[in-house]
Amino acid sequence: ASAAILAAWRRVETIDGIPQACRPASEDEGYQAQDALVAAMGEPVAGYKLGATSPGAQEIFSVDKPFVGTLFESSLLQNGATVAKGGVTLYAVEAEFVFRFSADIPARAEAYSVDEVMAATGQMMPAIEVPDTRLSEGPKAGIAQVLADDGLARYLVLGSPVEGWRDADLPEHPVAIRANGETVSEGSGANELGDPR
């Protein structure tokens, strides 16, 4: 599965699904294929993205919880960067809250609280995600293939770290995307399942 996705990734093309002989059939198999893709990429991992973080997105992906994709160092772009036409197959952008950890959060059986995670967070910055897919059907290919496709991850354009973000009311914080001076999309932090934290 990872070989098919990696080949399409490098050619910036889509495929009509992962070949049946190696197509993941469950979320676990999808994440295993994603891990194999990360290993095959041979690039340093910079972080992770969450997908399907709103009820509408969960409906599109036919899931009831967010999923994870991997971001590589080459995926991170600085404020003002551009992505060339032909650099992705999916022409979309999403406004994001990005959190950069300042301490490790080791795996454990018990879920971490928001306060525990925020205590391990050093910075928050606005960002624009430029997702991409190597699957011609995109989300309709099913969550197992989407996970194998790195959760539709590709680029993340990072803004500057925000001073005083811990004191901000992030759920109520307005968010807007503008193109050529026109607002094309707007919402708030609450669009992220009630709270982007």
Language model region names:
Residues 1-194:
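Catalytic-core "active-site belt" of small-molecule-metabolizing enzymes
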